[in-house]
């Protein structure tokens, strides 16, 4: 079972809900829930086959790119820098699973 992947998905999902409660951005909530769902489904697929990392890798790369740009623009660690950093760690972990 890919507990790290499921934890990453839960963090993304929880973060989108928390962001919605603080700022009220409906589109941000929908996008965050969708990306969290993709990360969770990717973790489920990795749980069944350790080499099936395509969806998880795509999701982490997408989130690292989007949040990395936001972090570069805002220079704020929370939430953009944290999510970008965690996404980069997920990418590294998933690549190592392929080796």
Curated annotation (Swiss-Prot):
Q: Look up the domain of life of the source.
A: Eukaryota
Cell compartments where the protein resides:
Mitochondrion membrane; Endoplasmic reticulum membrane
Matching entries from Gene3D superfamilies are given as:
6.10.250.1330, Transmembrane protein 14-like
Keyword Metal-binding in the entry? The reply is no
Membrane-topology descriptor:
Multi-pass membrane protein
Membrane-traversing stretches? 1-21, 24-44, 79-99
A GO cellular component annotated for this chain's UniProt record is: endoplasmic reticulum membrane
Kindly state which keywords UniProt assigns to this record, in alphabetical order: Endoplasmic reticulum, Membrane, Mitochondrion, Transmembrane, Transmembrane helix
What processes in GO biological process is this protein linked to? negative regulation of apoptotic process; negative regulation of mitochondrial outer membrane permeabilization involved in apoptotic signaling pathway; regulation of heme biosynthetic process
User: Principal localization?
Assistant: mitochondrion
Q: Which family does it belong to?
A: Belongs to the TMEM14 family.
What is the protein's known function? Inhibits apoptosis via negative regulation of the mitochondrial outer membrane permeabilization involved in apoptotic signaling pathway.
- What is this protein called in UniProt? Transmembrane protein 14A
Q: Which organism is it from?
A: Bos taurus
- Taxonomically, what lineage is the organism? Eukaryota, Metazoa, Chordata, Craniata, Vertebrata
Gene encoding the protein = TMEM14A
